[in-house]
Amino acid sequence: MALFAAAAFMTVPSFAQQTSPPPIAAPSPSGNQAAASGQPDQAEMMKQMTELAKLNENHKLLASMAGTWSYTVQMWMNPDPNAKPEVSKGTAIRKSMMNGRFFVTDVTGNMQMPGADGKMKDMTFKGMGIEGYDNVKKKFIGTWADNMGTSIMMSEGDYDPATKTFTYTGEYEAIPGMKQKIREVVKIVDKDHHTLEWYEDRGGQEAKTMEIAYTRKK
């Protein structure tokens, strides 16, 4: 192969063999040039990212809720406000991940749900949530997935220290074209108890459809 390549090179006219000078590489902009052109200074950007990656009091607040919890949930599936709720129980295990930046909760329980025939049936419920505090958005953030669907719900919220209450808002789409706005209120009663109330937007009116009471297992 080298021989054929050399022969081919010999047949090329001499002007084609002349090599042009290598292109001059454009100098990389200095920090001052980058700032002048509107580009962030890389060193400053890395410094800011390092600061934003640090844990703070908001992460410590989430850490205080780590542990194993038993829960009792009440669900109002009937739109009639006077209807009795469906009651079920389960366990939630909440653990730290990524050195306390996030907290993952594994939920297992039994609940009554309507089957395809409309009759109530016992089913095993499994769910997983991840919560954290986003230093960039300055918001508490959460995701939720369970064995009752294939989507992942995302939410953002704030914490009111005066009432020891988290308030999250989000949206999910259980059926195509039917997006549902939700509001989730988590109130810390004490270090061993907290509650969760779930509200859904039903035709422009908010209705509470679920309430969960958590007790820390010791």
Please report, for each region that a protein language model flagged, where it lies by residue.
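Hydrophobic small-molecule pocket/channel-lining residues, especially in calycin-type beta-barrels
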Residues: 18-218
